Amino acid sequence: MTKKILIINGPNLNLLGEREESKYGKTTLEEVKKNCESHAKLIDVEIKFHQSNIEGEIVTMIQKSKGNFDGIIINAAGYTHTSVAILDALLAIKLPTIEIHITNIYNREEFRKNSLISKAANGIICGFGVKGYIMALDSMKEIIS
């Protein structure tokens, strides 16, 4: 049976390709989605790709993933540093989780160096640009196989 991975993107990631190109690059979120879909076919997994600017919607996505997905890849963006609700949802569903960030959160502003959600993650991929999504897919495939 084909494994299913949920990819969740948090606030402002819908603006990829438009905002702070020096940090986030020129690739749009739609291009990231297409790249993930292509790579998912190559490694024989199914993905569902979501983006929301609303914390509660992200929590609901996570809660609904139990029984429907084998793992979660999450770029919680700004909620990484603030959302106990997202952390609690990830801990509650007990699915393998990979936290991802386009930039290296550890060489940015001090407040970005603290990830609340990492406590629920099997691993963290950060600082590799949008290529990190492909790295996360490969890593998740290994975890859930």
Question: Where do the model's predicted regions map?
Answer:
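Extreme N-terminal starter segment of soluble prokaryotic enzymes
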Residues: 1-5
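Short, acidic/small-residue loops that bind anionic groups at enzyme active sites
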Residues: 91-107
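Short beta->alpha junction loops
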Residues: 46-56
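Short, glycine-/small-residue-rich phosphate/pyrophosphate-handling segment
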Residues: 49, 107-145
